[in-house]
Amino acid sequence: MDEILKLLQTNALESRENIAKLTGLSAAEVATRIADYEKRGVIRGYQAVLNEDKLDLDTVTAVIEVKVTPQREGGFNTIAERISKFPEVRSAYLMSGTYDLLLFVEGRNLREVASFVSERLSPLEGVLSTHFMLKTYKRLGVLMHQDSSDERLSVSP
């Protein structure tokens, strides 16, 4: 992968000047390459990695495994693209193994996610199980909890 892209993945706010120093390119060349990556769709956007615990957000993320029958025309793409268009679906992946699709669905609360699953997703043939994340330890390469103290109680016979 291009060194500029690696640096931007680590810190999308890195200055063009600093990227130039780190890569040995001029700041103008760095800016030109980044603009080209954006134009060609190599860079699809920029996001901040948020620690939701610090924001006191009331969001629930559900991980949903979906088994589907491939369509005669379009294989898995037809159903995957249809599911991906739901605004509640934050990410969708084609998987190998027992399940065909892995979805990350977000809602304001458990009731909202459950409503999405029961009213919009479940009517689509093949939804087998739903798993809810309880805690995020690492997101997009960033550790969410720096406190190393272990607050669990010891278990003894």
List the predicted regions and their residue ranges.
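A compositional/biophysical signature of low hydrophobicity enriched in polar/charged and small residues
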Residues: M1-P157
